[in-house]
Amino acid sequence: KRLLEDLGIKINEIIPEGASVKNLINLPKAWFNIVPYREVGLMTASFLQKDFGMPYILTTPMGIIDTADFIRQVQKNVNKLAPFFLNKTFDYESYIDYQTKFV
């Protein structure tokens, strides 16, 4: 959650964390989905991609390389819709550089 908040990403829903059936109606509102653990959520993400054209990210942001890859995938997905809805694009490279500079 903190990483996405640092990037200015609003989280729509976290499923299954504290979710109920009422929350499921919000799933198609997301620009993309994140599946940090393939064992949980991959089938749902595949369904949402197939039925709603909603992409998903499978990379788990653990370690420097995977975290940087994850952030770049977030950037790619955000920038597919941000120009239309927010009239701008995002570049997270400086965030990646700063976070990995002292490691």
Curated annotation (Swiss-Prot):
Binding note for cofactor: Binds 1 [4Fe-4S] cluster per heterodimer. The cluster is bound at the heterodimer interface by residues from both subunits.
Record EC number: 1.3.7.7
Compartments, record wording: Plastid, Chloroplast
Gene Ontology cellular component list: chloroplast
Catalytic activity: chlorophyllide a + oxidized 2[4Fe-4S]-[ferredoxin] + 2 ADP + 2 phosphate = protochlorophyllide a + reduced 2[4Fe-4S]-[ferredoxin] + 2 ATP + 2 H2O
Keywords for this protein: 4Fe-4S, ATP-binding, Chlorophyll biosynthesis, Chloroplast, Iron, Iron-sulfur, Metal-binding, Nucleotide-binding, Oxidoreductase, Photosynthesis, Plastid
Main location: plastid
Cofactor(s) listed in the protein's UniProt record: [4Fe-4S] cluster
GO biological process: light-independent chlorophyll biosynthetic process; photosynthesis
Keyword check for Manganese: no
Pathway in which the depicted protein is active: Porphyrin-containing compound metabolism; chlorophyll biosynthesis (light-independent)
GO terms of molecular function: 4 iron, 4 sulfur cluster binding; ATP binding; metal ion binding; oxidoreductase activity
Chain's role: Component of the dark-operative protochlorophyllide reductase (DPOR) that uses Mg-ATP and reduced ferredoxin to reduce ring D of protochlorophyllide (Pchlide) to form chlorophyllide a (Chlide). This reaction is light-independent. The NB-protein (ChlN-ChlB) is the catalytic component of the complex.
Oligomeric and partner information: Protochlorophyllide reductase is composed of three subunits; ChlL, ChlN and ChlB. Forms a heterotetramer of two ChlB and two ChlN subunits.
Record family assignment: Belongs to the ChlB/BchB/BchZ family.
Protein known as: Light-independent protochlorophyllide reductase subunit B
Species of origin: Equisetum arvense (Field horsetail)
